[in-house]
Every structure is written in structure tokens, then in C-alpha cells.
Amino acid sequence: MAKDKIHPIVVQALENEQWTITNDPLYVEYDTDESAFEIDLGAEKLIAAEKGNQRIAVEIKTFAGSISNQFHSALGQYLDYKAALSNSEDDHDRKLYIALPEEAYNKLNSIRFFRQRIQQYELKFIVVDLESQKIVKWIE
């Protein structure tokens, strides 16, 4: 699977926030190899002791080109990956996020149809400032 152009920037942004990349890509098998997925990143971060370990999986998207086509593709992948993760012995506890540039998130958020789908499917985002290579928002 080809890595998006912003892949190294997202990796750096996560590392800047003390995330340790554990799998790049994260391989999740559902039933067989035919239904296996590669998710761009697996990362885990130790949170305060009372919260335990927080584990995430991150799909990286640039949202270049048609925003409608890119959203449709990202939504389909997100739903498939979420189902695969929930059935995985090793990775069922990972929270799934879509990492995307701040500009792309702002554009999605400005269109009512996309806002409604984001709420409907409870999408989670990591919004990244590409210039500073920093995470500007975690959308839960």
C-alpha cells in the first residue's frame, strides 16, 4: 500500500507528542489473508498510571483532489479497519484515527454533509499542521 505524502510528517508529529511507533504499517487480519488490512501506523503512548496504556491505529489521508471522493474512500476504509480491529485478538483495544492536514479537516468541517457523516459514524481525527509538523487537534 502506497504511503501518503504526509506520512513522515504525521510520524514526526506523533513522535513530537511522545508516541512510540510500534508498527508501520499495522497489519490486521480479519478472517484470512484475503480479508487482511494494512493500517498506516500503530502507535502506543503511556498515559498516567490510573489510565493505563492508550493504543491507537492511524490511517493517514491527504484529502488531495476531490474532497467528496477522498471522504468516501476514507470513510469506507475507516469502517472496514474499525471492524477488523474490533475482531483482532492483538489490536481490539486500539482507537482508530484518520490523520489529515489541518486545511483538509477545516474544509470537511465547513460542509454540512461531511459534518453529519463524521457525527453519524463517530469518526476520530488527528489534525496535523504540516508546516510545524505538530498535532493541532485530536477530534474524538
Question: Each predicted region: which residue ranges?
Answer:
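An N-terminal amphipathic alpha-helical segment
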Residues: 69-83
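Nuclease catalytic cores
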Residues: 2-11, 19
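Short beta-strand-loop-alpha-helix junction that forms the active-site gateway
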Residues: 60-71
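Charged phosphate-binding loop/patch that engages nucleotide di/tri-phosphates or the phosphate backbone
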Residues: 120, 124-140
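Nucleic-acid nuclease catalytic cores
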Residues: 83-119, 128-130
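Active-site metal-binding core of divalent-cation-utilizing nuclease and nuclease-like domains
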Residues: 20-57, 70
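Basic, low-complexity intrinsically disordered segments
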Residues: 55-57, 65, 109, 113
